[in-house]
Amino acid sequence: VKNTNEVDTQSSIAEMQSSPYLLDTSALLSFIEDEAGADLVEQALKQANTLLPWPVLLETYYITFQEAGQAEADRRIALLKQLNVKILWDMDESTLLTAAKLKAEHRISLADAIIAAFAIRRNAVLMHKDPEFDALTGLLPMEALPYKSFVDTKQE
């Protein structure tokens, strides 16, 4: 006698594994900076169908530029282009309209709306560690990495 719950779980895991991962900037930076969840990003990067939309490269570049300078930003982009990922350089009309609706209906940044729209239109699992994406729970499959915790250092 088969346990139907077990079969359902196994088939949903297999279904999740067949869907591509789409990495948000927060997930990619976790991998680059070896933060909590970097191992999960590394596993996703080993899959042949992992996706990186252009806003992730844009954010990675400008954040790195601000924090570590242009040389490091250039180095990171060069390394990202060597990864076994599909970089999504173009945005079609359906992705644009999906992003616009997400931005209109939810409290998320424009970049996050575009990144989520790419995931929705590509039937991908959005891997992130950005609590802003919590607003989109139920709209697309997501794998949240451990969020950063900020310690209040104020003296009372």
Each predicted region: which residue ranges?
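Short, well-structured N-terminal submotif of metal-dependent ribonuclease cores
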Residues: 1-52, 65-78, 150-154
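Acidic, PIN/NYN-like endoribonuclease modules and their adjacent C-terminal/linker elements
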Residues: 1-18, 116, 120-156
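Active-site neighborhoods of divalent-metal-dependent phosphate/nucleic-acid chemistry enzymes
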Residues: 2, 86-129
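Structured helix-beta-strand junction loops
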Residues: 46-48, 82-83, 122, 139
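Helix-loop "lid/cap" segments that line or gate small-molecule binding pockets
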Residues: 63-66, 85
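Short, hinge-like loop/turn segments at secondary-structure boundaries
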Residues: 67-71, 106, 143-147
